[in-house]
Amino acid sequence: MKSAPSEDRERALAVDILIESEAWGMLPEAEDIVRRAIAACPHPALLRSRGRAGWGRHRNAGVSVLLCDDATIAGLNGRWRGQHKPTNVLSFPAPPLQGAAPGEKIPLGDIALAYETLAREAEENGTTISHHLSHLVVHGLLHLLGYDHHMKDEAERMERLEREILAGIGVADPYAGCDADT
């Protein structure tokens, strides 16, 4: 059963964006792109997320997005994943909130994106920075919701959902012609 449009609006994710790197000034519409990509994620994806299935009774959920540079994301990657190098996107799911009252804001987690890596990958892949940013925001949000791509079937499910969400906002299939996982 599809929820009414007003219910969808009431359940929209709150998005907090911190622009930490001046490099993002090269893409002045970055905040709008992030918000649009997050808003494009359908509620069924949120409601059936592993470990977050009960969030549907809460009308307020939020995600924080850090728009940073390669140096910052390399530090985060080293600290939290033991990989001392830049990457395009990192997702940090919030731990499940115990005993949250209906109406209380539920933090889903944080997403960090590095401008230099994102811009380089966009050029290498022949896509726009805007489209690549949209893809990585959706990818990061799906990680916060419990989706992953370590196993082939998980990767296929996650990539299929990414394609559907991105198509809804006019972004071409980021996996067309690719064999590798993101």
PLM features per residue range, with description:
Residues 138, 142-146:
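Short active-site segment of divalent metal-dependent hydrolases/proteases
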Residues 1-133, 145-182:
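An acidic/histidine-cluster motif and surrounding catalytic segment
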